[in-house]
């Protein structure tokens, strides 16, 4: 699927404000209201994988004789628009904005409270 995205003429990589390791809250879908840590971001598809959210079961056939099949549960990706950054300290969700501090370093902060993330 990634190859087909790259072959499009007007293809642009989407800038994601959510990073790996951020705590996010699901704002839409079957897991609405749950919070979890971002395990992986997929910027080419604008998707994120969140720990313990959007679980899928996968049935694996045995590969060798004497081995039994297994049922695995793994996290599937969510669209980035369905999650929002969650602040544990303030217990609220907020959009993220970028700013440049006095030393000239680009940082992220919450739009609602102004709390600096990193």
Swiss-Prot record:
<keyword id="KW-0699">rRNA-binding</keyword>
<dbReference type="InterPro" id="IPR003256">
    <property type="entry name" value="Ribosomal_uL24"/>
</dbReference>
<dbReference type="GO" id="GO:1990904">
    <property type="term" value="C:ribonucleoprotein complex"/>
</dbReference>
<comment type="function">
    <text>One of the proteins that surrounds the polypeptide exit tunnel on the outside of the subunit.</text>
</comment>
<dbReference type="InterPro" id="IPR005825">
    <property type="entry name" value="Ribosomal_uL24_CS"/>
</dbReference>
<dbReference type="GO" id="GO:0005840">
    <property type="term" value="C:ribosome"/>
</dbReference>
<dbReference type="GO" id="GO:0003735">
    <property type="term" value="F:structural constituent of ribosome"/>
</dbReference>
<dbReference type="Pfam" id="PF17136">
    <property type="entry name" value="ribosomal_L24"/>
</dbReference>
<protein>
    <recommendedName>
        <fullName>Large ribosomal subunit protein uL24</fullName>
    </recommendedName>
</protein>
<dbReference type="GO" id="GO:0019843">
    <property type="term" value="F:rRNA binding"/>
</dbReference>
<comment type="subunit">
    <text>Part of the 50S ribosomal subunit.</text>
</comment>
<dbReference type="GO" id="GO:0006412">
    <property type="term" value="P:translation"/>
</dbReference>
<keyword id="KW-0687">Ribonucleoprotein</keyword>
<dbReference type="InterPro" id="IPR014722">
    <property type="entry name" value="Rib_uL2_dom2"/>
</dbReference>
<keyword id="KW-0689">Ribosomal protein</keyword>
<dbReference type="InterPro" id="IPR008991">
    <property type="entry name" value="Translation_prot_SH3-like_sf"/>
</dbReference>
<dbReference type="Pfam" id="PF00467">
    <property type="entry name" value="KOW"/>
</dbReference>
<dbReference type="InterPro" id="IPR041988">
    <property type="entry name" value="Ribosomal_uL24_KOW"/>
</dbReference>
<comment type="function">
    <text>One of two assembly initiator proteins, it binds directly to the 5'-end of the 23S rRNA, where it nucleates assembly of the 50S subunit.</text>
</comment>
<comment type="similarity">
    <text>Belongs to the universal ribosomal protein uL24 family.</text>
</comment>
<dbReference type="InterPro" id="IPR005824">
    <property type="entry name" value="KOW"/>
</dbReference>
<keyword id="KW-0694">RNA-binding</keyword>
């Amino acid at each position: 699927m990634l190859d087909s995205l790259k072959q499009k003429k007007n293809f642009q990589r989407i800038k994601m404000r959510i990073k790996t390791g951020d705590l996010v809250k699901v704002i839409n879908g079957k897991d609405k209201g749950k919070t979890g840590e971002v395990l992986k971001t997929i910027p080419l598809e604008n998707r994120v994988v969140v720990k313990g959210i959007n679980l899928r079961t996968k049935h694996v056939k045995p590969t060798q004789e004497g081995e039994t099949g297994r049922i695995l549960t793994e996290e599937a990706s969510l669209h980035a628009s369905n999650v929002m950054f969650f602040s544990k300290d303030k217990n609220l969700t907020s959009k993220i904005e970028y700013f440049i501090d006095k030393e000239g370093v680009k940082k992220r902060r919450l739009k609602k409270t102004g709390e600096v993330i990193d």
